[in-house]
Design a protein with these regions (language model features):
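Cofactor-binding active-site loop characterized by glycine-rich and histidine/acidic residues
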Residues: 8-23, 27, 31-41, 50-134
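Short, compositionally biased low-complexity segments
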Residues: 1-6
């Protein structure tokens, strides 16, 4: 009996790991597409934070795929928005064209926004730290 439970847990962890890899790939692709593949009239890169995404992918995969209940709410770290959008895409709440248009008009936002994003954002988490510059 214990062996069967252990085997089931191993399978579940392996599945979560595969989902995590897909989420990280989608998040990295979203940023790469915005900076290198999508046409840009002025040639400027739009940014994106792949390291911030990579640092949150395991945690966000565990939360969204296993731990969160329907009544739970999450404030996503702003620079991890591509991970959030990738998860929402896997849930069917975010279209691939939103990821393709990341940080452009009508695309997925660089910071989770309750008013601008089409997916289900619990809390808007805009750019942090810039407000303090207004007072200087």
């Amino acid at each position: 009996m214990a062996e069967a439970i252990l085997a089931a847990k191993r399978q579940e962890l392996a599945l979560l790991r595969r989902i995590e890899e897909r989420i990280l790939w989608l998040a990295s692709w979203t940023i790469h597409n915005a900076n290198h593949l999508r046409e840009s009239r002025d040639g400027l890169k739009v940014g994106g934070h792949q390291a911030s995404c990579a640092s949150m992918t395991t945690l966000m995969t565990a939360l969204y795929m296993k731990a969160l209940r329907p009544q739970d709410r999450v404030a996503v770290k702003p620079h991890a928005s591509p991970v959030f959008h990738a998860i929402q895409h896997l849930f069917g709440r975010q279209e691939i064209d939103q990821l393709q248009r990341f940080r452009s008009l009508g695309g997925a936002q660089s910071y989770p926004s309750r008013t601008k994003d089409k997916d289900d954002v619990d809390f808007s988490t805009g750019s942090v730290g810039l407000l303090s510059l207004i007072h200087i």
